[in-house]
Amino acid sequence: YTDVDGVYTTDPRLLPEARKVSQISYDEMLELASLGAGVLHSRSVEFAKRYNVPIHVRHSFSDQTGTRVAADPETSNQAVGGAALIKNEALVTVKGVPDRPGTSLAIFSEIAQEHITVDMIIQNVGADGRANISFTVLDDDLATTRGAIERALVELGSGHIESSTDVAKISVVGLGMAEQTGVADRMFRTLASAGINILMITTSEIKISVLVDREQAQEALRTIHAAFELDKAPTTTVLSETERRRDS
């Protein structure tokens, strides 16, 4: 039991049309938890997944049906089950560092010593044997991150730092991505149609994240949520393993 009545397709405080889902998979819930969904702690979801124990998320003071967290997603024919927005991101770019083995190690080992989590990472090869490395950290870690990079640049002998806190990360999550094509195309096309530029992209088997300007983040979340019809209940739902055995 919690102070919310279930798991939603996105944060209902950000998007009123967010829909409470009847069921969500362990893996989807873990991804959403890593993206800031505070409904369940990731450790509890990992424990439930390990022993295949369903979790029922519901409000402490309500009899309303909540959300079941289990092995299966809400539906098998929907590629995306949820979306998330993180606004407290900072973009860091280290420009003009030597394009040679050990450069990334020098930078990220200094950052790791500060116990800072690095998120999205892109490296581009520049001119004259130089490279540019971009990545994101949390806003609160930016000053410490810059200090760590400065130490690495002394060792590397060249390079300078640029940073911005005017960015936000939008992510879509869904087990169906592993089997359905066109998710990235729909997401990127939706953002382009809304005039929203993508600064960085990262993907996993069940997640796509993009970095956008913070002032466009709310509109990006709204258009993506609508493009994947997350406000609409699925026409078919997946039966749990227990229900399948009972019906067979």
How would you label these PLM feature ranges?
Residues 1-248:
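C-terminal catalytic "cap/lid" subdomain
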